[in-house]
Design a protein with these regions (language model features):
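Transmembrane helix boundary and interhelical loop/hinge segments in multi-pass membrane proteins
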Residues: 17, 93, 188-209, 221
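Long, hydrophobic alpha-helical segments
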Residues: 42, 173-191
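Membrane-interface capping segments at transmembrane-helix boundaries
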Residues: 358-364
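Alpha-helical transmembrane segments and their short interhelical loops
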Residues: 213-286, 291, 337-343, 347, ...
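Transmembrane helix segments
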Residues: 29, 36-48, 276-316, 320
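Membrane-interfacial helix-loop-helix junctions in multi-pass membrane proteins
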Residues: 163-167, 246, 297-353, 364
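Alpha-helical membrane-protein architecture signal
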Residues: 3, 7-11, 163, 171, ...
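Extracytoplasmic/periplasmic domains immediately adjacent to an N-terminal transmembrane anchor
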Residues: 1-171, 338
Length: 364
């Protein structure tokens, strides 16, 4: 082993890095950017949990609300007397937890059924409500212990988890993983595509042909969008076969969003590649995009637990809206219109990056 040769090769490689200023800048700035972002954003606090209360009497509803207001991170969105209203609020997405107080058997109402207080929970993301459920149960048990007559300590408490009855975390992550997989693949493919062609000389051949920028972008998009759609469907089917992930009818609407989602992220990578001078800097730009997207979209942590500024930034990323569409379609079984509604910001983002890609294509 010749140390002189190794030293000479090392010097050559170092000079190449120094000459590639974009790559060198990204090598230094990306780690700093990531540690700042992760350091400030990965401080998940306790989410504000929306609670709806339904009781047979207004006084009963007020008593429950008064007890709930003593708990932290709780917002009462509704307190009505109609039975089933709290259950409906959770099913329609207006509340995260619903409390259904039954009629209490007494001398005034001896025919009231002996039913427990129902705690209806949106269990799409079990981590979001775990602490609040424990506090409600603790407060209720303390109140029962404080009764002087244990024979009249009131009904029991029953927890009913909707959409994810067993509170399975794999059901929470599996639909969202379809978006993460497609995002990473498309951004990476888009980021290295143009840089690789430019370095290999094939980009000049493309530009010499009598094709417009629109035709060129459309031709590049078509196969990648197909690949991204197949990837997303494959994740859902695998989750269904291995983990029993439900695939209700609204999943079809969710699949319709996959081509737009894939196209958006391929064009993001393409625009990065147009600005980059080498494949290395293009890949670094891709990593700098998809890591914050994963962090701030609610994939790693419940979105509601992120700091307020992180939620604002997170709503810019298409992945955030795609994950909400995934949960609404696969777990909550919302109607197709509601699921497709999450595609509006994704399509808006697609329109912006498409214009940027056309501009970058003409500038090359």
């Amino acid at each position: 082993m010749n140390l002189t040769v190794i030293k000479a090769i090392s010097i050559v490689e170092a000079k190449r890095l120094i000459r590639a200023r974009m790559a060198l800048t990204l090598l230094l700035l990306v780690p700093v950017f990531q540690i700042i972002l992760f350091g400030y954003a990965i401080r998940p606090g306790e989410a504000i949990v929306r609670i709806s209360v339904a009781a047979p009497t207004q006084q009963g509803a007020r008593d429950v609300v008064a007890a709930l207001r003593k708990l932290p991170s709780v917002v009462i969105v509704d307190a009505v007397g109609a039975a089933g209203a709290a259950d409906a609020a959770v099913r329609h997405g207006d509340a995260t937890i619903g409390i259904e107080v039954p009629r209490i058997r007494s001398m005034a109402d001896p025919t009231a059924p002996d039913e427990p207080i129902r705690l209806i929970v949106d269990a799409t993301d079990p981590l979001l409500t775990m602490a609040t459920i424990a506090r409600i149960e603790s407060a209720y048990n303390d109140a029962r212990v404080g009764r002087s007559d244990m024979a009249d300590a009131g009904p029991g408490l029953s927890v009913e988890r909707l959409f994810n009855p067993d509170a399975r975390s794999d059901w929470t992550y599996a639909p969202a993983l379809a978006g993460v997989t497609v995002m990473i693949a498309m951004v990476m493919l888009g980021s290295i595509g143009l840089a690789r062609e430019r370095e290999g000389g094939s980009w000049e051949t493309f530009r010499s042909l009598p094709v417009s920028a629109v035709e060129l972008i459309a031709g590049k998009l078509a196969p990648h969008v197909l690949i991204g759609t197949v990837q997303g469907v494959l994740v859902l089917v695998t989750g269904h076969l291995l983990f029993g992930l439900p695939l209700p009818a609204a999943t079809f609407a969710f699949v319709l969003l996959l081509p737009f989602f894939a196209a958006t992220h391929y064009l993001i990578g393409f625009v990065m590649s147009a600005r980059a001078t080498t494949q290395l800097s293009a890949l670094q730009g891709a990593v700098a995009f998809y890591l914050p997207a994963m962090l701030l979209s609610g994939f790693l942590y419940p979105f509601e637990t992120l700091p307020r500024w992180a939620q604002v930034v997170g709503n810019v990323f298409p992945l955030s809206h795609f994950i909400r569409a995934a949960h609404d379609a696969v777990l909550r079984e919302r109607d197709c219109i509601s699921v497709l509604g999450h595609g509006v910001p994704i399509i808006a983002f697609l329109a912006v990056v498409l214009l940027l890609a056309l501009w970058a294509c003409r500038k090359q």
